[in-house]
Amino acid sequence: MINAWAQIEHTLRDNLNPGLFKVWIKPLAAEQAGDSLRLVAPNAFVASWVRDRLMNEIEKAAASVLGSVPTITVVSGEEPAAAPRPVQVPAQKRPAAARTSGAEQMGLPLHYASRSADSIKWMHSFDEFVVGPSNQMAFAASQDICQQSFRSDTLFLSSDPGLGKTHLLHAVGQQLCNISNRTLPRVEYLTAEEFATRLICALKAKEVDRFKARYRDVDVLLLEDVHFLQGKQRMQDEVLSTVKALQSRGAKVLFSSSFAPKDLNDLDSQLTSRFCSGLLAVIEKPTFETRKQILREKARLHHVQLPEQVADLLADNIRADVRQIESCLRNLLLKARLLNQQITMDMAWEIIGHYAKREAVLDIDAIVRQICSGFDISKEQLQSRSRRRELVIARNTAFFLARKHTDLSLEEIGKRFNRKHSTVIKGIANIEREMNKETPLGRQVVNAVNMVERNGRIIHP
């Protein structure tokens, strides 16, 4: 007999919008009372919202798993309840793994209890960050903001995707929680999109005051991907008010973005001013020596000593970003382990063949050509004013690749596609966001990017 709620969750994950699932279904825990299914929400607000808006979807999912619709109730975890018992289904129906405990479900909607250092899963630390000329300033600033002697209350980290912004924000959060003399350090970490989603939920539920209290009564606010706020005036107003309130109390605010403040458009001038009011640290692409050191450190974490020649080869050929460097290394280590062989230069060359080689360059013409081929559209359609969904996705993917692989400025990229540079920024932000989602569209975008990067490179003599 195995837990059925995980299988019901899996069905709901497939049927619901990813954001809806993450905010409202994922926090629920299941209990069995006879033939009834009891869902426990983190608080009364979530329980009420799920009852009013998602009960039909839950009943359909339960019926598809159990064969019939059980009696389903949704209650608040703040109410007294009997000891829970797992919901059971026959063992031949094998669901996905069960959800983690409530303590591990960070960032629940409008769950305002103070959070301890253990309630946020910090994935990275300063000790694991490889420092080089390209990121030295950002690393030092991130460390210093954890100290009382740091004179600024704001830090803005800017870089292309995959160069370490998230790593540093996690490291700051972990460090502050570790050195805090509080039992429950008040730290909030979320993306600008998550902030906006929770604000919308609070507005609909008339819980704005509680929302404000949550984010204005912290010691540190770590807000990622603030370029998402472009063109969203209501969200900008709330972020601005939150930042003002935090700074007036001496709290610290860290922002990250794929764009520098000067490149952000459709943004309130006061908010831009707040972004620029503290220290701005830009992370550039890592140098050869930094890339090599990253490879050594990551190999060490896997208890592998990387041969010097192999490290040189990988560092010299994989230059796009740190994520790609780490991915290449993981594939190399996995291949050696599966084949039960030593890591060799030949094996490394085979793995590099799936990534960008040093002499292979992806220029704007190749990007346009491959995008048109992959999306089955003409160059004229790609550069047209049409807002058809598939054309917008293709165009935004081209923006993303042009910024990643060429030296063209945002304005120059825009001119190539008859667009303003503000449109280019929004398009790139949308693609980055979709690539981080486990959705059909997200997978389509990732596949398109990989296809262009694999097929579109031209070899220079």
Curated annotation (Swiss-Prot):
Chain spans, region Domain III, AAA+ region: 119-336
Annotated ATP binding sites: 162, 164-166
Keyword field: ATP-binding, Cytoplasm, DNA replication, DNA-binding, Lipid-binding, Nucleotide-binding
Pfam families listed in its UniProt record: Bac_DnaA, Bac_DnaA_C, DnaA_N
Compartment(s) of residence: Cytoplasm
Single GO MF annotation: lipid binding
Top-rank lineage group of the source organism: Bacteria
One term under GO cellular component: cytoplasm
Coiled coil: none
Any GO BP: regulation of DNA replication
InterPro entries noted in UniProt: AAA+_ATPase, Chromosome_initiator_DnaA, Chromosome_initiator_DnaA-like, Chromosome_initiator_DnaA_CS, DnaA_C, DnaA_dom, DnaA_N_dom, DnaA_N_sf
Region spans: Domain IV, binds dsDNA: 337-461
Region entry Domain II, spans: 68-118
Annotated family: Belongs to the DnaA family.
Function: Plays an essential role in the initiation and regulation of chromosomal replication. ATP-DnaA binds to the origin of replication (oriC) to initiate formation of the DNA replication initiation complex once per cell cycle. Binds the DnaA box (a 9 base pair repeat at the origin) and separates the double-stranded (ds)DNA. Forms a right-handed helical filament on oriC DNA; dsDNA binds to the exterior of the filament while single-stranded (ss)DNA is stabiized in the filament's interior.
Subunit structure: Oligomerizes as a right-handed, spiral filament on DNA at oriC.
Domain comment, as recorded: Domain I is involved in oligomerization and binding regulators, domain II is flexibile and of varying length in different bacteria, domain III forms the AAA+ region, while domain IV binds dsDNA.
Listed name of the protein: Chromosomal replication initiator protein DnaA
Organism expressing this protein natively: Oleidesulfovibrio alaskensis (strain ATCC BAA-1058 / DSM 17464 / G20) (Desulfovibrio alaskensis)
